[in-house]
């Protein structure tokens, strides 16, 4: 299990861990950068049916609701779903939260316009069935945004060391390159766009303050060294034209590390 000072760049069953992380200075900086990248790839979600897979305590789902989306969130943890429902009630948000497994999503095919899945593939034994399930519930022409832990980062290196010293969480953690994420999306029948990176600093508060202003510029150069990677993928429709797939426009395409 993670400690109260660890990052929700990893999953945990205790909602208070996430709240404590977001309340810390490094957590607030890191969450802002991660959120900016994911929301930029999602684009305008007003009126769109969005499924948040692995929604945790509902933080991203609430932001999508504020932006006008019709949001559903699922998570394997009842503790997280209870926390998400409580937050939605306090805010008066009309969001449906339910317990559900990413590899067996409890909805009919082609139900959603958009699916977002942030840091869930890194903790499943086989990402293939999860992405195939996501593709199943996504309508033709719909978008998936994936956010995952980058393989070649200082955060990943520290977590590997923790695994060597007995961390059961990080022994099962999987860090991926941008190319691997694109391949997984393609194997599920989706058409992946470019991969973008974020969080290039080590898990150290002064470094976060120093490097955060340069995060977007670094993402334009490379995904190597990024603790967080994200991409958008489209589910092909009949007669689908790749040139008009509708990937959200980012300033510059990043190279996949």
Locations of regions flagged by a protein language model:
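Class I SAM-dependent methyltransferase SAM/SAH-binding core
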Residues: 51, 57-104
